Amino acid sequence: IIQMPEDLIIFQEIVYKTRPDLIIETGVARGGSIIFWASIQKLCGITGKVLGVDIDIRQHARNTITDSNFKDEIYLIEGSSVEEQIINQVKNYVSQHKKIMVVLDSNHTHEHVLSELEIYSKFVTKDCFMLVLDTVIDDLNIDPDRSWGPGSSPKSAVKEFMIKNSAEFTREQSYEDRALLSVAPYGYWRKI
């Protein structure tokens, strides 16, 4: 799992309190987070699924997921999270669920995250969360070879998105404050 331990504790609490029967995560990477979400649902007694969307799901990630005890709770879609064909597949899958949480953790550029916010925020159900991860990129300048960084990051995208959508979501800063070290400052949003 490529996350901060403090965030993982908060994620568990959010799943326990909101009880989503579907967690959508954009960005699969090595598959650890997808398995984490499925394991937390099961631990909380939630009969649910985790939908992972990634432009390039590597074989080692697929193997990790299919070798896990949670393979039956996980469904993967390969393709760009903002492509119409992929969005239609997500819409079809979402229609089977009532309580939906979204975790955005794929391409971290401002434009991509803003597109994801505009698309995936519509899937989040009342009182469930939209987590925008790696907003901390905006506060750091440690990888200048990337297409993202200060000013073009998940945080800059969230700030722009919330100008027009603040009536739909409320920032749950108490989680950020409790996490202390978080990859998602300004990234915990609950649908109201």
Question: What is each model feature region?
Answer:
Residues 2-192:
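S-adenosylmethionine/decaboxylated-SAM
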